A protein has these predicted regions:
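Phosphate/pyrophosphate-binding betaalpha-module
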Residues: 1-52
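A glycine-rich helix N-cap at a beta->alpha junction
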Residues: 1-10, 80-86, 90
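Short beta-strand segments
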Residues: 4, 12-14, 60-64, 96-97
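Active-site-proximal beta-alpha loop/turn segments in soluble metabolic enzymes
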Residues: 22-31, 60-69, 100-103
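Short, contiguous, pocket-lining structural segments
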Residues: 37-41, 50-51, 70, 74, ...
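Phosphate-binding glycine-rich loops and their immediate beta-loop-alpha structural context
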Residues: 40, 46-70, 76, 87
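Amphipathic alpha-helical segments in well-structured domains
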Residues: 75-79, 114
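A glycine- and small/hydrophobic-rich beta-loop-beta segment
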Residues: 85, 92-171
Length: 171
């Protein structure tokens, strides 16, 4: 939390103990052929997000041939359900529907995707990655009451400065 407070960003992963019942519920969904049940999908996702204790949440709901939600209608239903669950739990929640019928960016694989993200932070990178990054950041800043333009932070180097401080401080 100290790095988050001083730098304003941190990379972390939730442990399996965050929402321990989720794994069992997924196995039950698999056994009962309800893996595609939107209320259960949303409950699984939001149980972990709410358990994190966040005040605001921006969700990127993918739609298209490369996504779990193949149609706009199902993606909208999932987004509405996710936002509703978040709001009921007292978490300011918004969701963007983003296309996933073609790959995002030009990289495939963790290491090269991180490299591509660093290119975006440095003011470059593929246009579609920049567009999505700015849209998600704009939503998160608005949800947090911050009146900043993330595109400006990319252009003037502030985003890269925060990245470097975060990497340095996290070791």
């Amino acid at each position: 939390m100290e790095i988050l407070d001083t730098v304003g960003a941190v990379i972390c992963a939730a442990g399996s103990g965050l929402a321990p019942a989720d794994k069992k519920l997924y196995a039950l969904r698999d056994t009962t052929s309800t893996v595609e049940c939107i209320p259960l999908i949303a409950s699984s996702i939001m149980s972990k997000k709410i358990a994190e204790g966040t005040d605001s949440l921006v969700l990127d709901v993918k739609v298209g041939t490369g996504a779990f939600m193949k149609t706009q209608e199902r993606a909208r239903e999932l987004a509405r359900t996710l936002v509703g669950l978040g709001e009921q739990a007292g978490v300011r929640t918004t969701a963007l529907l983003t296309e996933m019928s073609v790959p995002l960016g030009r990289a495939v694989g963790n290491a090269v995707e991180v490299e591509e993200a660093v290119q975006v932070l440095a003011g470059g990178g593929p246009d579609d990655v920049v567009e999505l990054t700015v849209a998600l950041a704009r939503e998160m800043l608005a949800a947090s009451g911050v009146q900043e333009d993330p595109a400006e932070a990319l252009a003037d180097g502030r985003a890269m400065d925060v990245w470097r401080r975060m990497i340095r401080d996290q070791g």
